[in-house]
């Protein structure tokens, strides 16, 4: 699929037609969820954050809004929506959830479920000073271009795993965030 002229309707159609298979197994891992906020426009955008440099883990990294599931969360989707509201002031009722991607295992011991949602273009994002340094939007067609991501094999504690690296403007997009974006691209039929 050529995605340089990807419209929101194209994205929605492809996502719905090629709905991912999610098995629901948690494998006794701690659960977390992230929101993949797609901005509703003729040429949609992908909303991302840069984490605060003051955070203990993943400081300064580009990420989707999200985090660990709390006991008060009714579901993984509820956790993603709560975290998006806490981190960037996206009201949960403004998100049209269209589905989830298969969970991803993090190096920090979480099983992370990406929740795909459409958000209005006129939201006023407000970054939580404690957690988020900045909020930015990347054109979805650019984010889903697989050629922009470069593999790096990392060896840790005797195990090897592949991470993906990319730049957008002055933001370094890598690791789990880049991997989730690539998975979304593959899910809607983008080919390398």
Curated annotation (Swiss-Prot):
Nudix hydrolase domain boundaries: 29-160
Pfam families: NUDIX
SS bonds (residue pairs): none
TM regions (residue ranges): none
Chain sites annotated for binding Mg(2+): 83, 87
PROSITE patterns in the cross-refs: NUDIX (PS51462), NUDIX_COA (PS01293)
NCBIfam families given in the database record: PRK10707.1
Name listed for the protein in its UniProt record: Uncharacterized Nudix hydrolase NudL
Source species: Citrobacter koseri (strain ATCC BAA-895 / CDC 4225-83 / SGSC4696)
Taxonomic placement: Bacteria, Pseudomonadati, Pseudomonadota, Gammaproteobacteria, Enterobacterales
């Amino acid at each position: 699929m050529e995605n340089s002229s990807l419209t929101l309707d194209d994205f929605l159609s492809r996502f719905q037609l090629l709905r991912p298979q999610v098995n629901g197994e948690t494998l006794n891992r701690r659960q977390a969820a992230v929101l993949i906020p797609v901005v509703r426009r003729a040429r949609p955008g992908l909303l991302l954050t840069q984490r605060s440099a003051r955070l203990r883990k993943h400081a300064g990294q580009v990420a989707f809004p999200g985090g660990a599931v709390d006991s008060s969360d009714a579901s993984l989707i509820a956790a993603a929506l709560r975290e998006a509201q806490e981190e960037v002031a996206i009201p949960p009722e403004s998100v049209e959830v269209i589905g989830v991607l298969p969970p991803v295992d993090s190096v920090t011991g979480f099983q992370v479920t990406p929740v795909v949602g459409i958000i209005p273009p006129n939201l006023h994002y407000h970054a939580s000073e404690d957690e988020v340094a900045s909020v930015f939007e990347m054109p979805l067609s650019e984010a889903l271009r697989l050629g922009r991501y470069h593999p790096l094999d990392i060896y840790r504690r005797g195990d090897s795993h592949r991470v993906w690296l990319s730049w957008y403007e002055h933001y370094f997009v890598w690791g789990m965030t880049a991997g989730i974006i690539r998975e979304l691209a593959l899910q809607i039929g983008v080919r390398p």
